[in-house]
Amino acid sequence: MKLDLKILDARMRDQLPAYATTGSAGLDLRACLDEPLTLKPGETALVPTGLAIHVGDPGYAALILPRSGLGHKHGIVLGNLVGLIDSDYQGQLMISTWNRGETTFVLNPMERLAQLVIVPVVQAEFNIVDDFETSERGAGGFGSTGKH
């Protein structure tokens, strides 16, 4: 798949998103900051990536996901948990960054902060019904299928 990419910050020309391994699903996104950003516990910030994408094909979307190491080691996660980039969006990719940890975290310019994953999308059409065909599960949710 070819994805249109617009470079909004010249520093990104030498650090384009790339797959780390042949099996990687995500492309690393960097914090395109001019100076270090200090996030105290509980604080959030909207961090620019210096990049804009245009997926273009309504059969695909992009997801911005956290990097596991930052979340596990430092409590740095996405403020919106998952960022959904629709196929027709053309603005800069921004990363909602939340320090859910107990200590202050300093995010340095050009540090890898999140990852971008391209996923297929199916746009559903509704079929209005009065009742559903009975299933084994029914309306059970929130642990109704048991612990194991």
From Swiss-Prot:
<keyword id="KW-0378">Hydrolase</keyword>
<feature type="binding site">
    <location>
        <position position="80"/>
    </location>
    <ligand>
        <name>substrate</name>
    </ligand>
</feature>
<dbReference type="InterPro" id="IPR033704">
    <property type="entry name" value="dUTPase_trimeric"/>
</dbReference>
<dbReference type="Pfam" id="PF00692">
    <property type="entry name" value="dUTPase"/>
</dbReference>
<dbReference type="GO" id="GO:0006226">
    <property type="term" value="P:dUMP biosynthetic process"/>
</dbReference>
<dbReference type="GO" id="GO:0046081">
    <property type="term" value="P:dUTP catabolic process"/>
</dbReference>
<keyword id="KW-0460">Magnesium</keyword>
<feature type="binding site">
    <location>
        <position position="94"/>
    </location>
    <ligand>
        <name>substrate</name>
    </ligand>
</feature>
<feature type="binding site">
    <location>
        <begin position="67"/>
        <end position="69"/>
    </location>
    <ligand>
        <name>substrate</name>
    </ligand>
</feature>
<comment type="function">
    <text>This enzyme is involved in nucleotide metabolism: it produces dUMP, the immediate precursor of thymidine nucleotides and it decreases the intracellular concentration of dUTP so that uracil cannot be incorporated into DNA.</text>
</comment>
<dbReference type="InterPro" id="IPR029054">
    <property type="entry name" value="dUTPase-like"/>
</dbReference>
<dbReference type="GO" id="GO:0000287">
    <property type="term" value="F:magnesium ion binding"/>
</dbReference>
<dbReference type="InterPro" id="IPR008181">
    <property type="entry name" value="dUTPase"/>
</dbReference>
<dbReference type="InterPro" id="IPR036157">
    <property type="entry name" value="dUTPase-like_sf"/>
</dbReference>
<protein>
    <recommendedName>
        <fullName>Deoxyuridine 5'-triphosphate nucleotidohydrolase</fullName>
        <ecNumber>3.6.1.23</ecNumber>
    </recommendedName>
</protein>
<feature type="binding site">
    <location>
        <begin position="84"/>
        <end position="86"/>
    </location>
    <ligand>
        <name>substrate</name>
    </ligand>
</feature>
<keyword id="KW-0546">Nucleotide metabolism</keyword>
<comment type="similarity">
    <text>Belongs to the dUTPase family.</text>
</comment>
<comment type="pathway">
    <text>Pyrimidine metabolism; dUMP biosynthesis; dUMP from dCTP (dUTP route): step 2/2.</text>
</comment>
<keyword id="KW-0479">Metal-binding</keyword>
<dbReference type="GO" id="GO:0004170">
    <property type="term" value="F:dUTP diphosphatase activity"/>
</dbReference>
